Design a protein with these regions (language model features):
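Signature of dsDNA virion morphogenesis modules
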Residues: 1-192, 209
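Enriched but not universal
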Residues: 193-210
Length: 210
């Protein structure tokens, strides 16, 4: 599972007369997220979700999608299957509204989440997704080099992805394992070259042989 992120503060929490909380959020398309600044010697890496990149599973109403705290399925807030998550796809963004019932508010991690969000500590929205198999979607992604006038980053644009969950986080974060799980190999023309299934193993063996 890959994690994306947009630290936008586009989250809104309101309490209804019933005692339930209504949580609304918005994840924008076509906005570059900086996954890595490249460190001292590397190149920055950015990721862009193209318009309606998450449309497939969102538009299939029988596909379950979860709203989680920190990408943990042990800390769910809402889901489609439970009837507590309404998520919609649009040209400019994915939007959702979740209902957090009074009973859920008594759960420790939910209470902690509500406290953190009310205090302004939880402002990030991060999708959990997978890239579909190449046999199903041949051109799901591409990697290009940034215009020299704008910088030297590698930019990965995702056109189709399978969305499984949205997570509320303190800020979107990208561990090194997450960054390396992505394909960052451009061709001379700037398009991605899919790596073979043994490419990671071959790179490791080559390092030991050197």
């Amino acid at each position: 599972m890959l994690w994306g992120g947009h630290d936008s503060g586009a989250l809104e929490l309101r309490k209804r007369a019933s005692g339930a909380f209504a949580l609304r959020g918005r994840f924008p398309y076509n906005k570059a997220a900086v996954l890595s600044d490249g460190g001292r010697t590397g190149r920055p890496r950015k990721e862009v979700m193209a318009s309606r990149a998450f449309a497939y599973r969102i538009n299939k109403r029988d596909e379950d999608i979860h709203l989680l705290v920190g990408h943990s399925y042990d800390r769910p807030l809402a889901s489609r299957s439970a009837g507590t998550l309404d998520i919609r796809d649009g040209d400019d963004a994915v939007t959702f509204e979740a209902q957090i019932a009074p009973e859920m508010q008594e759960v420790t991690y939910v209470r902690d989440f509500l406290g953190g969000m009310t205090a302004g500590l939880i402002v990030g929205l991060s999708p959990g997704f997978r890239i579909p198999p190449e046999r199903a979607v041949p051109d799901a992604e591409k990697v290009e080099e940034e215009e020299p006038s704008q910088g030297m980053a590698l930019i990965r644009t995702i056109f189709a992805a399978l969305l499984y969950e949205m997570s509320l986080v303190t800020r979107p974060a990208y561990p090194e394992t997450q960054i390396e799980a992505r394909n960052w190999t451009p061709t001379e023309g700037g398009l991605v070259v899919p790596e073979g299934p043994r490419s990671g193993l071959n790179r490791t063996l080559n390092r030991w042989r050197a």
